[in-house]
Structure formats: C-alpha cells, structure tokens
Amino acid sequence: FSILLFDEIEKAHPSILDKFLQILEDGRMTDGQGNTVYFSETIIIFTSNLGIYTRGADGTREANVTSDMPYQEMSVRVREAIENYFKLDLGRPEILNRIGENIVVFDYIRPEVAVRILKSQVDKIIRNLQSEKRITVSLSDAAYQTLEEKALANLSNGGRGIGNIVENFLINPLARYLFDHEIFGDATLKIDEIQADALPPELKCS
C-alpha cells in the first residue's frame, strides 16, 4: 500500500487534472510510452484552501469562513465553494463527481484545543532542557497566562501560529536569558514573568 499527497491542488494547471481524472476513474494511469501504473492499493489525498476566501463585489479577497464560525456553517460554505470551483470556474464537474462525498473539511483550531497544543509544546521544551542540558525550568501562573493570552489572540494561523508564539515569547527570550547569565547546565530556573511588550520580549526569572 502507498499514500500519495498532492498539496494545494487548486494551484495545479488544469491539464494536470486530466491525469487525476484518469486515476480516479480507472484506478490506473498510462504514460505516452505505454507504461501503466496501477493505483488500486493507493490512498490519494488532495489538500486545498478552496473556500477559505472569496472574491468581493469589488474583486478584492474576502474571508469566506472565520475561526469564530460554527463548524457546521463553515463546512457548508467550504463545500459550496469547492463545488462552484469545479462546476463553474473550471467547468469540470466530472472531477468533483469522481471525488464524491470524500471531502473532509478541517475545523479551525478552537480555544480549548489551542490550550492543549500550547501546553504540549511548553512541556516538550521543559523536558528537552531537562534531558539535554540538565536545566530545570518552570513557569509561574502569570508567565503561562501571558503565553496563553498570546496564543488565543489570533487562532487563524492554526498550530503553526501557536508554535510561532511559543518561539517568540518563550524559546527565543529563554535562550537569550540562559546565554546572558551563562547558564549552560545543572541549573534550576523559574520564569516569573514574560515581558511580552518589550522588543524583543524578555523574561524575569528567579
């Protein structure tokens, strides 16, 4: 068995879709030299950002779905946009017919999930410092709350956005603090405060 992943399929040239149509319809593809590849034991995944944005009356890009929208409403809007793209924009409804109902609309990261992702990333940093540098790090409630507020401020960038928050407000300032204070191992450190408004962000530790 094998898995094929085609990322952001809407960016492919329309002629490429003819190849996919052959695969989805016949389960095989033959090249110009008569070589045939069979896909009977292959899972094919297409990813797409279709439906996230739409064109406004003035032609500018507008958000079609938002992170505060209920999942059911968001799913309906995305599916409608995908259908319109294949039927109206491309004029290729047969491709959509081959895909059928096998469309999974991923939800935005909701606040309760974002908190879990944040905790997982922070815990990993603490474990790595302990195991690799023998540096024991903990965060005060206030410091952790600062991270949480930053992570929840804008969830439109998903897990990557949360990772950027952790990097900008914890990893980088912590690395600077350890270097400036010549802490290279066998130490215990408590982060009392994250000064998020400083440029760059700084830590107060004890």
Per-region residue spans from a language model:
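AAA+ P-loop NTPase nucleotide-binding core of proteostasis motors
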Residues: 1-206
